[in-house]
């Protein structure tokens, strides 16, 4: 039997011979302390212990050890930076978003500087209207034209609480978000006479995480809850999100409402379209829609179509009382196909 032995080290130099042993850091992974400003280098030494003795084996022969190997060095740089919003990003004292300029500042931190704001809390303090030239939050790392399965994806990963305020998208404008990863958007009202895309998140795409490796785990995409599509709103594509992602990139949509008078698919030329989602993997629960949905193929009252075949696509305790019009084939009152 082979048993791995792990030991993590840290150093102020990029050198595996000058590190200091980290007491208790003996697992395959290690989460460093990021509360202090500065640059620290981390690496792990691994050695395998062989244990194949029985009760007749002499004590000194019961264990043998393989050669020690060392991991690559991981650089962790912690920078103390003040942000332009009131609050500190905690659940009890979230960053306060009062104006469109606050949203623009958030976008620049994500799209230009690569901040993800993992688990940081933001709260809208009033109604906000996006400008007609709004560029959504979330993009690709500088110098990269493709996400490479998430490796070069600069996505928002925080928690946005709309606090029951209304976000209005300009006529013909783009939605609030482009790319998100493990984000939460909640307690928000959405409006826009003609939103040129999806209503909330414009890019639902394959995301295997920051290393782009499926085998190390795939993040969920978003949890969307208590979001209301207000009467008079219309979208070119699905009302919240859609696209084609990995089956493991789950989206949870819960307690969401689309009022009567909402139009989904105002051109009538889109396929894979529904009130809340287009191509979709995840769960919709406790949602209701009275919207009018137009499309060509795979047009559904709540969901256009199941996305990746191996992923989930579940709708529970939800209803559709609106109208679905499909000029092609595959249409349904709940899911198109």
Identify the role of each PLM range.
Residues 1-80:
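Ser/Thr/Pro/Gly-rich low-complexity disordered regions
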Residues 79-337:
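Surface-exposed repetitive/solenoidal architectures
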């Amino acid at each position: 039997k082979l048993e791995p032995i792990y030991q993590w080290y840290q150093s102020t130099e990029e050198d595996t011979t000058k590190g200091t042993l980290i007491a208790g850091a003996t697992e395959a992974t290690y989460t460093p302390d990021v509360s202090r400003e500065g640059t620290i280098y981390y690496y792990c030494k691994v050695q395998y212990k062989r244990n194949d003795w029985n009760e007749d084996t002499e004590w000194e022969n019961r264990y043998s050890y393989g050669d020690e190997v060392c991991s690559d060095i991981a650089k962790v740089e912690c920078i103390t930076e003040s942000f332009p919003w009131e609050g500190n990003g905690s659940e009890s004292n979230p960053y306060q978003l009062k104006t469109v300029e606050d949203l623009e500042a958030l976008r620049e931190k994500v799209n230009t500087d690569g901040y993800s704001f993992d688990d940081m809390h933001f709260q809208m303090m009033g109604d906000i209207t996006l400008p007609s030239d709004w560029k959504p939050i979330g993009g690709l790392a500088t110098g990269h034209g493709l996400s490479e399965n998430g490796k070069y994806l600069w996505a928002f990963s925080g928690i946005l609480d709309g606090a029951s305020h209304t976000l209005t998208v300009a006529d013909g404008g783009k939605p609030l978000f482009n790319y998100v990863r493990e984000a939460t958007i909640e307690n928000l009202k959405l409006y826009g006479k003609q939103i040129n895309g999806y209503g909330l998140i414009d890019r639902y795409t394959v995301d295997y995480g920051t290393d782009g490796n499926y085998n190390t785990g795939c993040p969920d995409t978003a949890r969307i809850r208590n979001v209301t599509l207000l009467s008079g709103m219309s979208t070119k594509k699905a009302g919240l999100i859609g696209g084609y992602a990995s089956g493991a990139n789950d989206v949870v949509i819960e307690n969401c409402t689309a009022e009567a008078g909402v139009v989904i698919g105002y051109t009538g030329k889109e396929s894979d379209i529904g009130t809340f989602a287009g191509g979709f993997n995840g769960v919709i629960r406790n949602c209701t829609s009275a919207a009018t949905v137009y499309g060509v193929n795979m047009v559904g009252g709540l969901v256009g179509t199941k996305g990746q075949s191996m992923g989930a696509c579940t709708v529970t305790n939800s209803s559709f009382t609106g109208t679905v019009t499909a000029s092609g084939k595959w249409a349904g009152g709940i899911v198109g196909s």
